[in-house]
Amino acid sequence: MQALLFLMALLLPSGAGAEEIIGGVESEPHSRPYMAYVNTFRRKGYVAICGGFLITPQFVMTAAHCRGRRMTVTLGAHNVRKRECTQQKIKVEKYILPPNYNVSSKFNDIVLLKLKKQANLTSAVDVVPLPGPSDFAKPGTMCWAAGWGRTGVKKIISHTLREVELKIVGEKACKIFRHYKDSLQICVGSSTKVASVYMGDSGGPLLCAGVAHGIVSSGRGNAKPPAIFTRISPHVPWINRVIKGK
């Protein structure tokens, strides 16, 4: 139930408290040029907010639960409430789900967004490297997450990109969740620290040594760590096939 509440909160309407990084700091403007601000337009004017990240000039990766019929991606943003000259706003042509995405368990919570046109790579817009198929981010590794979500349960949405350093922990810590599989997911965040991802950060990357190893997927409704990230490495063969159009 906690994971469900967290997921629902991740998809709050724009301006109504879509979640943010907890225990982090504001990022240096455009220091994370791969970050994408994803808007999913749903029925009755509802807009869901997620993070994402650019992996090729024409593909953005995010969480599968962030998908929708009409989506727009903003690249090169720091303050999403301003029209920064670095920003590139591009509509999504289509989304591609992995064949084994499980809605109920959130296993394989990953989706590729094909943009209607290629992004123009600049100092503020660039791609991030992915791991190899056998690269397994291990417990004890220190990584970084970033997003525009809330900074706390009762806090308002952040308009500027924020980041937080998080530690990968053992799978035992994520046994509090009904569904967790270490081969497909990463358990992130020490229970002894007030630092985590939260509502609105969903779909954003987990970077370890400059490589995107995970995608923000779900967590606890009270915002306390740990949180669950989708593990990217098992999906690399599928990702490569999609990018190559196979």
Curated annotation (Swiss-Prot):
Gene3D superfamilies cross-referenced by the UniProt entry: Trypsin-like serine proteases
Gene that this sequence comes from: Mcptl
Q: Does the keyword Protease apply?
A: yes
Q: What is this protein called?
A: Mast cell protease-like protein
Q: Which residues form the propeptide?
A: 19-20
Instruction: Write down the superkingdom of origin.
Output: Eukaryota
Keywords, A to Z, come to: Disulfide bond, Hydrolase, Protease, Serine protease, Signal, Zymogen
Gene Ontology terms, MF aspect: serine-type endopeptidase activity
Q: List the disulfide bonds.
A: C50-C66, C143-C208, C174-C187
Annotated Peptidase S1 domain residues: 21-244
Q: Which PANTHER family match?
A: CHYMASE 2, MAST CELL-RELATED (PTHR24271:SF23), KALLIKREIN-RELATED (PTHR24271)
Q: Does the keyword Hydrolase apply?
A: yes
Q: Which residues form the signal peptide?
A: 1-18
Enzyme Commission no: 3.4.21.-
According to its UniProt record, which residues of this chain constitute the active site?
A: H65 (charge relay system), D109 (charge relay system), S202 (charge relay system)
Question: What InterPro entries does the database record attribute to this sequence?
Answer: Peptidase_S1_PA, Peptidase_S1_PA_chymotrypsin, Peptidase_S1A, Trypsin_dom, TRYPSIN_HIS, TRYPSIN_SER
Give the family from UniProt: Belongs to the peptidase S1 family. Granzyme subfamily.
Q: What biological process terms from GO does the record include?
A: proteolysis
